[in-house]
Amino acid sequence: MFRSVTAWTYTLIVAGVWALSEAVGERSVPTALLVYTPAAVWLAPAPLVLLWTLWRRRGVAAALAGTLLAAWGAGLLHWRPQTAGALRVLTFNVKEGRDTTPARLGALLRSTDADVILLQEANFAAPGFDAELLRRLPGYSVQRGYETTTLTRLPVESFRRVNYPSDWRQVLVTRVAWRGVPLTVVNAHPGRLKFGDAPRGDFSLIRPSLAMRAAQIKTVLDIVNAERGPLVLGGDLNTPPRGLAYRQFIRAVGPDAHDTAGRGPGWSFPQLSARIDHQFARGLTATRATVLAVDQSDHRPLLVEYR
């Protein structure tokens, strides 16, 4: 059975990483590192392992199994049916507008025909950027928090800001009317996990950032758990599609839109081949989820259609 130590070692490592990420997740520093390491990393050795087993003429099946498991974990095999939806929600980390202009960003946002737009890192660096951007988005009302902005062309029934503990970021909670029914939209941007020198055994940064993220995620979960009726949670959640935090969002809100109606890996942070921008919905069904291939930020926008 174990005709190739290399092939089986690779396959067992990939399976072990997936199992530990799901079962233990962020409960320990080592497994948190596994959760937040881009899934594409575990796919990188696959070509070499396959070539080695083909050359040795042994262990090819095991190497292929490990490759398929790694490709599945990276989202490369993901493919869901898609149809048009009546409600369009866009989330986009705009990186303070440093890689774009009001004209370019405004044109992009208009082209999506989104009913609701959730922006993160919307504390624009250039003076007057936000005013010029809004001038290019007629018909949208704006709700601002520190570093987050929600725009909508739907009637706004209520709006509030919620502070994270020990942080300057704010969660925006906007209630709009859609088809005569109240719909709550939560725009969130929890902080990222800070690795520091954790791979070398220095946990001085990662432990506090794990605690900070846990507190921030609890804030978001408290918000969505207190709301009733249809709800969309979206934003740069700095959370890969595995691990404890990801499962908490699904349990509290509902399915991940990309899982339901996306195709391909959905990498919204292409520099690290990572999917960390999400939308989760309750009382709505995602019919199409698309990561837009644009270069106006280090993130890519996620556009989801719902019915």
Predicted regions and their residues:
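Structured beta-strand-rich core segments of catalytic domains in phosphoester-bond hydrolases
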Residues: 70-82, 94-96, 101, 116-193, ...
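Acidic/histidine-rich helix-loop elements
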Residues: 91-101, 194-210
